[in-house]
Amino acid sequence: MGEIQIKSDVVLKGYWKRDEANAESIVDEWFYTGDAGFFDEDGFLFIHDRVKDMIISGGENIYPAEVENALMSHPDIIDAAVVGVPDDKWGETVKAFVILSEGKIQSEADIISYSKEQIASYKCPTSVDFINDIPRNPSGKILRRVLREPFWEEKGRNVS
């Protein structure tokens, strides 16, 4: 898995009046999409997640979509989002925000235990907040920066 890069005559030449964004996204005429993906054995490209959303915990790369899919397989969870939050030992750790089905009760320990049955333990949330709404943009994408901001305000996100 790696960051998807494209080069073509029909790829944008740059962002209008955004020199810093251009320097980050376009290198030697290659456009770095910001998406992490991979090719399968048949040559099909699969987009897995956004590189900037990747959580780095103890040197391990954790993609939020994988953790969210594991959480969403729980019968009592109707929506979930995860972000990386500061951790003195690991750099970042996974924090989950979960919406439960109406009338359902689960503890933080229940959700963490369930996730350990679904994915590798280093990818599992170390804390869970039960919330009523997950912030999304008009196209339905999770606004991770809104969820992440309160935890990084004092520190500044020190991992890429």
Label the model's feature ranges.
Residues P150-S160:
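Acidic/polar alpha-helix N-cap and adjacent early helical turns
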Residues E29:
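FAD-site-proximal beta/loop scaffold in flavoenzymes
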Residues S8-D9, K13-G14, A36-K123, G140, ...:
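AMP-binding/adenylate-forming catalytic core of the ANL superfamily
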